[in-house]
């Protein structure tokens, strides 16, 4: 089992209707981004988006990107990541 840790960017934004929002994305995964009403929601949605993105890569036979310079770390054992 491998664990992958992806760096995320989270910034204040707004929805199309002007309501406050947070935009979250992973720089190493082109096009993998989402929004939420608060930071926690945006990060939770990003976690789901990353899982779906990686599922699509695996289904297509593509490798999961590993590039520490772009914020992607692979570990050869299970890991727990805690955001504080």
Which role fits each region the language model picked out?
Residues 1-9, 44-84:
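Short, charged, surface-exposed hinge/linker loops at domain edges
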Residues 2-5, 16-17, 30:
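ATP-dependent carboxylate activation and anion-phosphoryl transfer catalytic cores
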Residues 6, 22, 32-34:
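Structural detector for hydrophobic anchor residues on beta-strands
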Residues 7-12, 39:
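Short, charged low-complexity linear motifs
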Residues 10-27:
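Short aromatic-glycine-(Arg/Gly/Cys) micro-motifs in beta-strand/loop hairpins
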Residues 26-29, 47:
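ATP/adenylate-binding site constellation spanning eukaryotic-like Ser/Thr protein kinases
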Residues 30-41:
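A short, exposed loop/beta-hairpin motif centered on an aromatic-Gly-Thr core
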